[in-house]
């Protein structure tokens, strides 16, 4: 029968796996790392709070897509909490942690990643429902959106707790990984493969939607009335989503590949030398998202700017021309029916020309 090591400190597992815990991070180097990390985390808290507040206060954002976008910002906010906890429980401190505290540290990171990933999957479903039905926004009710958000967090919390629930190597030391010394290599393989598979599915779905919208926009543009900005609104919304997805994949894929190599017990891969850089890259994803939201949507930018300047928000104010016009229209406008009406007009024009 295998001996279990629940009562050991983490130095026992780090020493067995020869894991680098950055003992050299002392003095000036440690202060610089903590200062830079603190700055990024404060920005994550501030900017993602603005995104959530903007969706709540501005009625132009009261659509399923933007509720889910706010939930993605909440996942980034949670990631900031996970990174703060990591900063003060890493380096030389890592070896002094108890098993439960280390599992909490890693569980927070796993939960934040799963929440972001699951939320992007839900957004993919919402976008597919709306675009394939010729609408800018889906007809999901607030109740259904709320249930989807709760489902996202339930899945995220469960996935973050799986190692704590038993899928670890505390009773089978020979199965321990190197980067995560009390995670089983089998769990790392499962976790990374499932995430990479989800990445692939999302990319396929979004590329399919993007190509569909682009094709429809190109076909309908010569035959439809209305401003160019309104005709291109669906494409602009998809570009925002694709930019967020692209940033997520670029920031997280390298780290997941390294974890997969560790799970496969690759001895020649030198995974220890790159782990901190890929963790920093993952941190930058939560920094980038609010910047993407505000840059790609003028209404989001204006709402966030007014909140920063403590200016009153007038939801009835006339919008100014934007560098990239917002994709949101009022409910009394043709926003939700725009694509459907455009197709009808295009068909009429085609018949007339024939």
UniProtKB/Swiss-Prot annotation:
One of its GO terms (molecular function) is lysophosphatidic acid receptor activity. The keyword Transferase does not apply. It is a multi-pass membrane protein. It comes from the Eukaryota. One of its GO terms (biological process) is positive regulation of MAPK cascade. Residues 1-31, 89-101, 168-186, 262-276 are extracellular. Glycans are attached at residues 15, 172. A lipid is attached at residue 309 (S-palmitoyl cysteine). It is found in: Cell membrane. Belongs to the G-protein coupled receptor 1 family. Receptor for lysophosphatidic acid (LPA), a mediator of diverse cellular activities. Seems to be coupled to the G(i)/G(o) and G(q) families of heteromeric G proteins. This is Lysophosphatidic acid receptor 3. The gene is Lpar3.
């Amino acid at each position: 029968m295998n001996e279990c090591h629940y009562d050991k400190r983490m130095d026992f597992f780090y020493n067995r796996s020869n894991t680098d815990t950055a003992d050299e991070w002392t003095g000036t180097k440690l202060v610089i790392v903590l200062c830079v990390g603190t700055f990024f985390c404060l920005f994550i808290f501030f900017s993602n709070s603005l995104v959530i507040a903007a969706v709540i206060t501005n009625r132009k954002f009261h659509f399923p897509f933007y509720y889910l976008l706010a939930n993605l910002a909440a996942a980034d906010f949670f990631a900031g909490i996970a990174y703060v906890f990591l900063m003060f429980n890493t380096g030389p401190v890592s070896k002094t942690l108890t098993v439960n505290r280390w599992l909490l540290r890693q569980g927070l990171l796993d939960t934040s990643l799963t929440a972001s990933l699951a939320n992007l999957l839900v957004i993919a479903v919402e976008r597919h429902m709306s675009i394939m039905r010729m609408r800018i926004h889906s007809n999901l009710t607030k109740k259904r959106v709320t249930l989807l958000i709760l489902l996202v967090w339930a899945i995220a919390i469960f996935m973050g707790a799986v190692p704590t629930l038993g899928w670890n190597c505390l009773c089978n030391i020979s199965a321990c990984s190197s980067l995560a010394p009390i995670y089983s290599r089998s769990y790392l393989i499962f976790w990374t493969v499932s995430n990479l598979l989800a990445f692939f599915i999302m990319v396929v779905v979004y590329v399919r939607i993007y190509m569909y919208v682009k094709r429809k926009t190109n076909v309908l543009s010569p035959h439809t009335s209305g401003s160019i900005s309104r005709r291109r609104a669906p494409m602009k919304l998809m570009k925002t989503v694709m930019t967020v997805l692209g940033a997520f994949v670029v920031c997280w894929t390298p780290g997941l590949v390294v974890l997969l190599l560790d799970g496969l017990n690759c001895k020649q891969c030198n995974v220890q030398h790159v782990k901190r850089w890929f963790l920093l890259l993952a941190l930058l994803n939560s920094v980038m998202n609010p910047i993407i939201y505000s840059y790609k949507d003028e209404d989001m930018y204006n709402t966030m700017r007014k909140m920063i300047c403590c200016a009153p928000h007038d939801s009835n104010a006339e919008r100014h021309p934007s560098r990239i016009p917002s994709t949101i229209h009022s409910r009394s406008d043709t926003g939700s029916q725009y694509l459907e009406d455009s197709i009808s007009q295009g068909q009429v024009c085609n018949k007339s020309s024939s």
